Amino acid sequence: LKGVLILTLVLSLLGAEVTAGSEVPLKQAPSSEAGDEDLYPVLKLNSLIERANKENHEIVMAKARIESSRYRIPQEGALPDPMVMIGYENEGWNRYTYGEMPGSRWMVSASQTFPWPGKLSLQKKASTKESEAVYELYEKTRLSVIEELKIRYYELYYAWKGLDIIEEKLKLFELIEEIASKRYSSGMASLGDLTMAQTERYMALQERIMLRQKIESLQAMINSLISRDPTLPLGRPEELIPERIEINQESLKNSIEDSPDIKEKKGLLEAKDLKYQKARLEYYPDITLTGTISLKPDPYEDMWGLTVTLNIPLFYRSKQRMAILERSSERDEAYHELEGTRQMVASRILDLLSMIKASEELMELYKKTFIPKAEQSLEANISSYRAGRIELVQVIKALNSLLDYKLMYWFQVAERQKALASLERLIGRPLSSLNEGNR
């Protein structure tokens, strides 16, 4: 509607005649072929997110890592495999003497090693914590993919809005060029006016080519994120209704610990601490029980035996002590990594909140101040041009300013949506849930 009003204003005040039925298309798809509206249906963000959750290769791989980490948990808590030994002792060197000599016998033994109490349980708990960290890494990966998908979606939305404005601009300068040409032919305008109008139209054509290429590039990126052939066409993003969003600061502050980035680091720190505790138990020996049966022929009695074997940590200075120091260093590293992530998330949240606030203020400024003022300026310049007080170049500058302000407005709309997407990824949930939790 705005484009139609601007077009009518330019035509009427420049003195051009608007022929009946000559409507101006304000929205066009990158392809100039007929039937574009059928080729480019409405593209819904929720549908893209749903497909990405199911088909995106990074998400599928991260989900597979969860399964593999869970399979490792029972392995870490299992006892070592038992050992079975079958042997024979012969009395004498020259011949097989079983049944002839009392010392000849067949032997069967079985042994089982039991780690010192607490070792296996700590090992299993550490593996469980690592699996939980892998799950949080999956959530982090999934949310990162969705964040990138949203960012590309809103960039595509802005590119389409830019194409709308360029198409509007192109149509206006085609009409201005036609009017300038008629005025030049009748001696009412200079050649400079005609040249200026032509130059602006050619620049608009160049911008349209670049925007169409940008749209195709963004469509390929989105297709890649949803595991779709990059060459397949996508629809046009559905229309946004820019509204100011109230973010509960207290709820946002409390939700920092729910960030998948922080929860992943927490799980890794807990796993490192459990491994450190397990390393301290390595000073204690493992116990191996062995039972043996010796089979002798008649009239000799069979024999049995039971032994207990302990491993002695004799070289603890270079082995067990070094292992404890190693695990302690890993735990310290994980702790500082967690604290660094906390600070990074908190800092990034403040940065995004600042970006959102700035974008909303600029949107308000463009919508209520710059664009209305630019429309008034355009109207005044056109009136002055008709009266012969200014050159056409002043009208063109005023028109360009108005269209540029409209473009910057939609740029801020897209930037705000992109910042909101990044904020939701950081806290791991929709912003709407923050306000719901305080009702």
Predicted regions and their residues:
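Small/polar, glycine/serine/threonine/aspartate-rich low-complexity segments that form flexible
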Residues: 32-41, 85-119, 123, 235-246, ...
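Bacterial N-terminal signal peptides
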Residues: 4-14
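Periplasmic alpha-helical coiled-coil/stalk elements that build and connect Gram-negative outer-membrane
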Residues: 18, 141-258, 352-355, 359, ...
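Bacterial Sec-pathway N-terminal export signals of envelope proteins
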Residues: 18-88, 113-114, 230-273, 339-342, ...
